[in-house]
Amino acid sequence: RLLKQSVARLKGDENAIRSRATVRLDFTTSGVLSETDSPEPEIAVDVSDVIGAYMPEHFAAETRLRIDFYRKLANAIDAKEVEDIGEELADRFGELPREAKALLLETEIRCLAEEAGFDRLETEGSSLQCRFAKGKKPNKDNKFLKVAGRLPKLSEKEPFLKLKEIVRFLK
């Protein structure tokens, strides 16, 4: 894969030059969240405001298989590839639990952000911050995407619906 990307870069393929995006969503966690857990120790977290985005052990019990799927998701470059991975998971293990669906949506968000030319996508409350990658800014004064002069806002309150709203926004 690295060799293919390097050859494509040398040929001037724009997709090969695409930078990786970092996704930081304040309403997701990459593991099981308990009542006492919080990304910031001094901040109390209402567990209903946070969704786990991970591959649960009860869904795919074998560690090696979970790692393989995490690797596939990390290497995914577009939404179609993420969809194919989701179908493979469902074929292999059955109905996807909410956490696995959230992980797939979070990965799709990363892929869509990369396609849109963002190197970072973050949420802070209802605010959605999409930072343009170097060389991708529409003008030199704005490093963040703005709609009508403001950062985009999320209207959904429930974490899973927020993920879907971000996907719709990026499409």
Language-model segments: which ranges?
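Accessory helical-bundle/CTD segments and flexible terminal tails appended to RecA-like ATPase motors
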Residues: 1-171
